[in-house]
Regions:
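Active-site rim/adjacent substrate-binding subdomains
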Residues: 1-148, 153-164
Length: 164
């Protein structure tokens, strides 16, 4: 499949504020195309996660990948995480312990905004992968934050709604 870099849909576009719809055919060519476009675009824009609405697709899919970036002094080696695909994800648990940390977003990039957001330190999530196989994942630290941030996108929420 040819690499396609999508512009990141910005806040103000109605798809960013709409609740994304479930994917009905997880293994379709259309779903595979969305996953590939999300992955290529996330990597191109230097993001650690990207959700369907961020490329104008109002479907419940997001991808994450925490790669090494020498310009990011705050990223620990323990935070690195391979590419993960989440289709029709559902948060199934969240820790009581909350952690405040800085977030940014490709969908508010024009404003260069960052904000401090309090989120559970760890979460459990269930989703389907690109092969239609259901999986459960317990995430903590940066991956937990990225998952929650991307889940918010699927529900029409942007981090600035939660920032202090």
């Amino acid at each position: 499949m040819a690499m396609v870099i999508r512009k990141t849909t910005q806040i103000g576009n109605k798809v960013i504020r709409a609740k994304a719809v479930p994917v009905l055919n997880v293994r379709s060519k259309a779903t595979a195309k969305i996953i590939q476009d999300l992955t290529d675009s996330m990597r191109h824009h230097g993001l650690v996660g990207m959700a369907g609405p961020q490329i104008g697709k109002g479907v419940r899919i997001f991808v994450t990948e925490i790669r090494y970036n020498k310009s990011r002094k705050d990223r620990k080696l323990s935070d690195l995480d391979p590419l993960r695909i989440f289709i029709n994800p559902c948060l199934i648990s969240a820790s009581r312990r909350q952690v405040k940390d800085w977030e940014g977003c490709g969908s508010v990039a024009y404003a260069g905004l960052f904000g401090s957001v309090k989120r559970p330190a760890s979460v459990g999530v269930e989703a389907y992968d690109e092969n239609g196989i259901k999986f459960a994942l317990k995430a903590s630290n940066l991956l937990a934050r990225v998952i929650q941030h991307e889940m918010d996108h699927l529900n029409g929420i942007v981090f600035v709604d939660k920032a202090d």
